[in-house]
Every structure is written in structure tokens, then in C-alpha cells.
């Protein structure tokens, strides 16, 4: 209960305070001292290893299976960003040659790699492994590596790939049965894949796991690739720690923990989110811009969800639409803090991008933010007034409140390659973006349903679905899961060439969907309660280096 003075009277204001847990990290990431000699040594050795790896990739006369395996290992080890053109050229050649393999393992690997790189290879590549009834042959049940690759390939399916629905069911049931009896490290790889498939995983998280838990234990490992991957991971981690220290200092200076104690203090988790969108060194500026934006919109989200009154939120919404510092006097004191911080942040972005002649693109992110706040206000009004909208009305508003239209747009601000045409394309909410947003919405809604219900929130997606369709909670959640699966098919389809924008642009949209899958795994809200889900990932990526 909070009180506010109105005229000569004091009015009691009941606020829906959520009582979020404090940060897990304290000042742990506030400072970071770099050992320049170590970093320089890593960088020098990496250059030599890079050339050795390039020679491996460009080697002539290798079998198709060996080429595909090499590309897969390089990608899983997190070093493929050094060889994007070489890998694309090789896969282009394989696609155009229409090469076919007779074994399940190679066929599935070929299908997945080509699809992930935008080549529309036909799923008919798998028909040779089916019987006359269209079922996968039971003789494949003992080909565990083949089944694992088939399972991973099934997750890049589109709406036209019915055969891959069967592939997913077939591979899953046999892998689940076999997993406890497999030898290490295949056992660990299969167990991990069944919990988190590669295609929907956060690239850095998957790389860390693969280096330490799988490839290092492989008898057939390539020592050059393994050392390259370890050094590259540790060198990038130094950069990531520097960025996190910079962002942590910025966050501490804002002092929202003291001035806005009702909001979640999650700047480290926000950095993990940005790291999931892009980990490569050339995106350093983009990452810092994105993490600051996520941290700031999280404060705004909690203001609407967990503190503001209808009148305050309407005034705040109007002030954001006007985007003028003179509006600040209309706001209650606590809202002035975030309002000024937001306007200052975007001025900083404009100043930072002006040296590259890109300050004009910031307006795209501002417009998206205005949209989010407007939709937050609708959502809060529903909550406070006890209104439960039809599912269609709920979704038309709730897709914007995922913040994913906004974050996708913001993710391009620091990308030097992002053009005005890319921003215009994104502003039309293309199908691939809609898919990523839907994935975020339905996974978030499913994971947070019980908590929101306990707080008296009736206008949730699950509740609206239950009422509209006359179904149980379990059935409503299954419907939402079906929406997520359909959206993943749309997203995968959006990657197939020809595409209206570059793959580099599309990858941000894909990676945003991946982060949601990981953050809300097992229907846990890993952002609000990071101790179970995100803490191990953050430790693996930002605390513990890999032993060389």
C-alpha cells in the first residue's frame, strides 16, 4: 500500500507490487581487468589456427560426408563466423550438385546444414529411409548417430515438410529409449539434444556445452579445431566481460535499484539476452545498445505491470508518445526518473551513431517503443478493470507487448550493415518477424500463467483461450504450443532463399526466438527467476573461462 497526497487530503493508492527477488550478481561484473598479454597471445595463435582451418575447409577431393561433418563441427565449436563465405560457397556447390548420400547420418546432416543456410533442399532426401507405408524403417533404430542427426534435422522443418513430422516422432522415441545405454560422449549429446535441440538453442550456450562436454571427449577430435575453439571462446569472453562491465557501470550510475525498487534488477540477464542475439566481435556496439534497451524496457514493463495506477500510466503513455522532455513535469516523481533516462538514452544513441552518419535510424526504434508503451497501457487497463478480451483482441495487443518488434528493430541500430531499406522492410512486420514475436508471446504466456493467475491477472492468453474455446488449462497450453510450432515453421520458411534481406539481418530475428526457448525452458520464467535457468548459462559464458 502506498499513499499519495491529493490537495489537502491523503489518498491511499493500492499498487500491484510484485515483490521481485534482487539481482543474483551484486557488483560482481562491475569491474573487469584485462590481461593484455594473454589476449594478444590468444589473438596471435588464433590467426595461425584460422589459416590451418581454412586450408582444411578448402581441401579438394574430400568425401561429401567428411565435408559436411567438418562444417558441422566448425559451426558447433563456434568458430564458423571466421569462414562464412567459404562455408556458404561449399554448401552452394553441394546444393547445386544435388549430391545424395545413402546413409541416414549424412543425409540428415546435409539437409539440416543446407536448410539452416537458406538452401531449399527437398525433404524427399529422406524417402529412401521409409517403408511402403511411409514409416521410417525400424532397421534404423540402432543407428543412433543417424537418429540424432535426423532428430536435429526435423527442427528446421516448414509447413510443407510432413515427412519431418514423422522423422521427429520416430527419432525422439528411439533416442529416448536408447539414451541411458549409450556410451559417452554420445549419451550426453543425445540427452542434451532431447532437452534442447540445436536449431532452437542459443549459439553461445550450445558452443560452450559442445566444446567442454562433447568434443573434448571425442576420440576422433581434431586438436587444431579444439584448440582454436577454446582460444576463440576465451578471447571473445574477454570482450564480453568488458562490455558487461561497461553496461553494469551505466546501470549502477542510473541507480534504479534505489529509486525504482519495485522493478526487476536484471541487467546481467539482459546482457545474456543481447549476447544471444549476436556474440561475434563486430557486433560489440550493437550488443551494448541492445542490452541497455532491454534493461530500460524491463523497467517500463514493471512500471505498468507492478506499480503504476491507471491515471499515472495514461499520463506516462501520453508523455512517451509526445517524446518531449518538457512533458516530464506532468509525471509523478518516480516516473520522471525513467522518462528522463529513456530520452537521455536515445540522445546518446543518436550521438554515438552520428559519427557513422547513422543517427537518423534511431527514429525507427523510438517509434517501436511508443507502440510498446501504448500496448502496455491497454494491457494494464484490462488488468485493473478486470476485462478479459477475446483471444484475437488479446493477441493483437499482446504481440506488441512481447517487445520483440521493438527489440528486433533496436538490434539493427549498431549493425553497420543494416540499411534504411532493412528498417523499412522490418517496419512492415514481415512474416518471419511475426513468427518470432508469436513464439515469444505464447512461450512467455505458458511459462508465466500460474504466477500471473496468482496475482489476479485474468486477461492472460491462457485464460482468454480457455474461455473462448471452452477448454481446460492443459488444452489451452497445448493450443499455444501448437501456435509456437507453427510459428517455428514460418520462421524456418523465412530463411529459404531468395530472401528480401540478407541472412545477417534474418539471424537476429531467429536468435531472438532462440533466446525465448532457452529462457522459458520447462515452463520456467528464467528472466524473473534466473537462479535455475539462466544462472548456469551466465556462469558458463561470462564467469568461467575454458581451460586450455
UniProtKB/Swiss-Prot annotation:
Entry similarity comment: Belongs to the terpene synthase family.
Gene3D superfamilies per record: Farnesyl Diphosphate Synthase, Terpene synthase, N-terminal domain
Cofactor binding summary note: Binds 3 Mg(2+) ions per subunit.
Cofactor(s) the record lists: Mg(2+)
Organism: Nicotiana attenuata
Protein name: 5-epi-aristolochene synthase 3
The EC number(s) this enzyme carries: 4.2.3.61
GO terms for MF: 5-epi-aristolochene synthase activity; magnesium ion binding; terpene synthase activity
Pathway as given in its UniProt record: Secondary metabolite biosynthesis; terpenoid biosynthesis
Amino acid at each position: 500500500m502506498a499513499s499519495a497526497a491529493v490537495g489537502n487530503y491523503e489518498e491511499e493508492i493500492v499498487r500491484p507490487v510484485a515483490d521481485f527477488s534482487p539481482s543474483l550478481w551484486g557488483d560482481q561484473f562491475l569491474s573487469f581487468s584485462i590481461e593484455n598479454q594473454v589476449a594478444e597471445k590468444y589473438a596471435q595463435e588464433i590467426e595461425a589456427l584460422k589459416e590451418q582451418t581454412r586450408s582444411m575447409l578448402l581441401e579438394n577431393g574430400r568425401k561429401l560426408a567428411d565435408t559436411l561433418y567438418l562444417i558441422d563441427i566448425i559451426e558447433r565449436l563456434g568458430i564458423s563466423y571466421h569462414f562464412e563465405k567459404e562455408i556458404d560457397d561449399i554448401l552452394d556447390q553441394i546444393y547445386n550438385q544435388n549430391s545424395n548420400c545413402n546413409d541416414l547420418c549424412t543425409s540428415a546432416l546435409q539437409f539440416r546444414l543446407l536448410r539452416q543456410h537458406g538452401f531449399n533442399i527437398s525433404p524427399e532426401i529422406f524417402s529412401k529411409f521409409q517403408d511402403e507405408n511411409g514409416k521410417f524403417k525400424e532397421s534404423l533404430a540402432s543407428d543412433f548417430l543417424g537418429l540424432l542427426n535426423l532428430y536435429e534435422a526435423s527442427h528446421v522443418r516448414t509447413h510443407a515438410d510432413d515427412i519431418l513430422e514423422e522423422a521427429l516422432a520416430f527419432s525422439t522415441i528411439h533416442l529416448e529409449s536408447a539414451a541411458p545405454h549409450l556410451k559417452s560422449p554420445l549419451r550426453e549429446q543425445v540427452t542434451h539434444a532431447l532437452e534442447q535441440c540445436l536449431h532452437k538453442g542459443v549459439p553461445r550456450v550450445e558452443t560452450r556445452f559442445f566444446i567442454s562436454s562433447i568434443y573434448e571427449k571425442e576420440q576422433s577430435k581434431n586438436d587444431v579445431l579444439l584448440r582454436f575453439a577454446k582460444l576463440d571462446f576465451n578471447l571473445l569472453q574477454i570482450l564480453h566481460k568488458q562490455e558487461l562491465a561497461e553496461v553494469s557501470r551505466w546501470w549502477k550510475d542510473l541507480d534504479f535499484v534505489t529509486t525504482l525498487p519495485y522493478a526487476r534488477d536484471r541487467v546481467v540477464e539482459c546482457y545474456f539476452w543481447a549476447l544471444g542475439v549476436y556474440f561475434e566481435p563486430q557486433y560489440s556496439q550493437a550488443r551494448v545498445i541492445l542490452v541497455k534497451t532491454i534493461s530500460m524496457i524491463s523497467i517500463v514493463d514493471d512500471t505498468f505491470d507492478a506499480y503504476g495506477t491507471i491515471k499515472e500510466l495514461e499520463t506516462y503513455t501520453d508523455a512517451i508518445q509526445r517524446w518531449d522532455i518538457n512533458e516530464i513535469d506532468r509525471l509523478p516523481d518516480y516516473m520522471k526518473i525513467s522518462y528522463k533516462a529513456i530520452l537521455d538514452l536515445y540522445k546518446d544513441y543518436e550521438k554515438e551513431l552520428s559519427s557513422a552518419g547513422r543517427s537518423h535510424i534511431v527514429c525507427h526504434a523510438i517509434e517501436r517503443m511508443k507502440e510498446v508503451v501504448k500496448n502496455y497501457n491497454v494491457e494494464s487497463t484490462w488488468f485493473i478493470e478486470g476485462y478479459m478480451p477475446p483471444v484475437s483482441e488479446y493477441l493483437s495487443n499482446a504481440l506488441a507487448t512481447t517487445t520483440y518488434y521493438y527489440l528486433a528493430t533496436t538490434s539493427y541500430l549498431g549493425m553497420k550493415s543494416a540499411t534504411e531499406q532493412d528498417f523499412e522492410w522490418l517496419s512492415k512486420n514481415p512474416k518471419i518477424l511475426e513468427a518470432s514475436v508469436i513464439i515469444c508471446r505464447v512461450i512467455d504466456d505458458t511459462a508465466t500463467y500460474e504466477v500471473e493467475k496468482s496475482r489476479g491477472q485474468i486477461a492472460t492468453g491462457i485464460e482468454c483461450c480457455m474461455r473462448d474455446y471452452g477448454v481446460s488449462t492443459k488444452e489451452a497450453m497445448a493450443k499455444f504450443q501448437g501456435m509456437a510450432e507453427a510459428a517455428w515453421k514460418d520462421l524456418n520458411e523465412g530463411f529459404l532463399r531468395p530472401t528480401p534481406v540478407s541472412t545477417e539481418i534474418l539471424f537476429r530475428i531467429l536468435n531472438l526466438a532462440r533466446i525465448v526457448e532457452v529462457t522459458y525452458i520447462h515452463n520456467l520464467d528464467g528472466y524473473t527467476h534466473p537462479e535455475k535457468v539462466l544462472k548456469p548459462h551466465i556462469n558458463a559464458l561470462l564467469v568461467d573461462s575454458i581451460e586450455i
